[in-house]
Amino acid sequence: MKKLFLLSISAIVTISALAQNPDEALRTAWFTQQGTARVMAIGGVMGSLGGDISANHINPAGIGLYKNKEFVLSPGFLFNNNKFNYRGTDSTAKNNGFGYGTSGFVIAGTNKGESKWTSSAFAVSVNQIANYNNRVQFRGFNNYSSFTEQYLEELTRDRADTNAALSNYIFGSSLAFRTFLVDTLAAPNGSVIGYQSLVPISTGTYQIYDARTSGGYHEIALGFAGNMADRLYVGGSFTIPIVKYNRELYYSEKDATTNPANEFSFFEYRETFTSNAIGIGAKLGAIYKPAEYIRLGFAFHTPQFMAYVDKIRSSIIANTENYAGLRKATSDELNSGNPGERKYNVTTPWRMIASASYVFRETKDIRRQRAFISADIEYVNYRAARFQATGDNVNNSTLRDYYSNLNSTVKDIYKGNINVKLGGELKFKTFMVRAGGAYYGSPYADAAIKASRTVLSGGLGYRNRGMFIDLTYSHVMNKDAVFAYRLADKANTFANQTGSAGTVMVTLGFKL
């Protein structure tokens, strides 16, 4: 059935396979707190406790509690078990892989003389903030929309003629046009008046989405903190975020009817996508002890300013039966065998942390502390993420308008929200028992998208003769939404994701 889909000019959509998707804003913003095994065992709490190298990435004032040198290494292993429901059809996907928590070293010492600053500490550490090793796979029957409609929107919005449709969108629309998955729509006099999709949406298709991702969001932190009379601790860290993200995507739509003459059998879209970034940022914080057993903390994380380079290769195979038969087109054929590349900048959301801890039998000698309970409240302004053109493209009016619209979309579909973390520890001479939990609220403004992350964790620790080892298991229960594609002319359909992710973390440390 031939039909022209019109695009609202004011709408923002994924304009090509190389364009940024608003979902990418969450990749470096919505994550559960990672750290050493000790920190993960207590739910990621480290806003006011200090004395752990993970503080360099949460509240750098916490490294001011160090009085000695320390070296820490934290290897880990992750388990992912995802469940999806897409338009009434359930599916599952599993993926496991290695990861790591906060690792590095701290150099600390007391200050001699009459200085008000009792001691100071310097730390260099690396932390895997997010692990991207995952698999997202779902399927279902859809008689509401099609992946191909994003190509119609793109060609219609740009008022593309047939020459442009053949060559200007080499990672998406041009592939669909060359395989006759999308074709021209002609008036009775033969003139081209638009474009049509050969996918019979009204009778429906069986859709499959299968994405395998790998990589991680890493952060190097160089921190310094000072200790004033064992009452006030202030610190800051200079951060270098590094992103390595890889995705292998397979997507298909298959005719749900048995009609061999409706000019559509199936199509398959394949994509290889990589995204690498490096940036700078800062974290500032303070911890105050109004009494020996109480610690209050506050930290502010500036936005991370990151420079991205994305690369992509894609292909489409389509069978339109007696319309054009079986056809294939690849981006390599249209781009001299090279991947597509785009450079741009991203500013991540800022965040604030307020924290309080109660330490039982608090003394200046941390070896004599017997227990603690601590809580963090974190606010993240997810809608503050921003995309920008870079280099020679800064003055490109088309890209400038595109990023302006994309940023408006980010502001519309996301919101700020609060994350709550709670944890505690009991110490029995050289052995410790720990437990914690956390709740991460939804970043989506649309209440219909049910998204959250709940963390339950526990662990054991051993400390003796300048050596310590910690073992933790952290269990994350996820709720999220996954969009196979986004459209501008109708409500988007998505898969509801539930499931769990488990992490086993071991931290080995030495007091030097």
Describe the function of each predicted region.
Residues 20-34, 108-512:
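Outer-membrane beta-barrel porins/channels
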Residues 12-13, 69, 431:
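Alpha-helical transmembrane segments and their juxtamembrane interfaces
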Residues 30-48:
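N-terminal targeting signals for Sec/Tat export/insertion, comprising classic cleavable signal peptides
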Residues 1-25, 512:
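Bacterial Sec-dependent N-terminal signal peptides
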Residues 45-46, 52-53, 278:
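Short hydrophobic/aromatic segments of transmembrane alpha-helices and their interfaces
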Residues 37, 49-58, 64-143, 215-218:
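Outer-membrane beta-barrel translocator/receptor signature
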